[in-house]
Amino acid sequence: MTDTVPVADLVDQNCHGVLRTELGLGTFEARLGAARAPAAPGTTFFDTQTGFAVRRWCPPLLGLEAHCPPAHYLARRRELGVAETSRRLLRATGVSVHLVDTGLPGDLTGPAEMASAAGSEAREIVRLEILAEHVADTSGTVDAFLVNLGEAVHTAASSAVAFTSAVTVASVGGEALRVAPEPPGPVRLRVVAGRWLARREEERLAARRGPGGRGGGVRVEPELLDHLRWSAMACGLPLQLRLGAADPARLADFAAATEGHGCDLVLLHGYPHHRQAAALAGRHPHVYADLGTVPARTGARAAGVLAEILELAPFGKLLFSSGARELPELHLVGARQFREALGRVLGGWVTDGAWTRQDAARVATMIGSGNARRVYGLE
């Protein structure tokens, strides 16, 4: 029989708030899918690894049998109400610290509400794109925008625990985005900033014209994001970079160029390129690999995927996160699946005699919470 290693304390180093509003079956189910869109006709997102994990872990906390029908679960959820459901599920995660990315739109709880509901400590992760948009709204000229942007980054650094960039390296307008190994020069930066501000103004005027206007947001220019990333790194806080579906190899030049600058890089949500992310973390002392979304998305296969990551990355370079957004169920599933999967992998090595139980417990603590406490200065 395979031994299991308990994973006690967790620091969720990247997550989002939960919705304050009630959800019907269709809207709840859509949030189980990666695209946050309805399932194809005749199918359901409950028939995914995430869906089965939700049905396994969540119903008992609401007083139901595990794997009960989704309709029964949603009915009980509505009966208890959003606040009580969130409280029960978040407190059952066993997460002691939530690092909350506050950049998502929607009626989501912030760090203070997350801390209250979960009985945890919560700190804010500042999304650079949102910071740029807020500054643009209050700056009348390009010069004023650039000055105010620099001040805003430094002000945010005084209270935030990290910065993050929401634009993946996967695609911008359908083309691969390369994260530049250097910031744009002053002249080029002014041109790029002016172009972005002009496009925002065009969109604002179009939206005011009503249904015929385009409306919508304007994606931050890639070179302006390069400037923002380097400005954020100068503050010394960790910088989280979302990989999306991109191969982390696209970040190799950036990782090499930023080594020795006093800022750690955390590669977020690398699955299905998790092995490449782990390898990059192994090559650079300031690069870390996040395990977020692997347990929830791979479900019963989570232990196998985690074992692949542990083959390549030093154990001190791996961080847990749920990556959860909108649904407290995803917070719970991320934590429960991670604990079970890591416990099984390490326990198997103990059973085989490859590791001692003491070493397995030490590594479990490192990955679950210790590494994050060190990287984000939570100790």
Residue map of PLM features:
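A gly/proline- and charged-residue-enriched helix-loop-helix capping module
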Residues: 126-147
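Histidine/acidic residue-rich metal-binding segments in metalloenzymes
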Residues: 144-165, 172-287, 301-319, 337
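H/E-rich (His + Asp/Glu) clusters that bind or coordinate divalent metals
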Residues: 261-379
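Active-site beta-loop-alpha junctions enriched in small/polar residues
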Residues: 16, 103, 127-133, 166-170, ...
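Alpha-helical scaffold segments that flank or form the walls of functional sites
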Residues: 26-118, 124, 147-158
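Mid-to-C-terminal alpha-helical segments outside catalytic/metal-binding sites
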Residues: 1-13, 19-64, 71-77, 315-317, ...
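Short catalytic/ligand-binding loop motif for oxyanion handling, primarily in non-cytosolic enzymes
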Residues: 18-22, 106-110, 133-134, 170-175, ...
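Conserved, mostly hydrophobic/aromatic
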Residues: 14, 98, 163, 232, ...
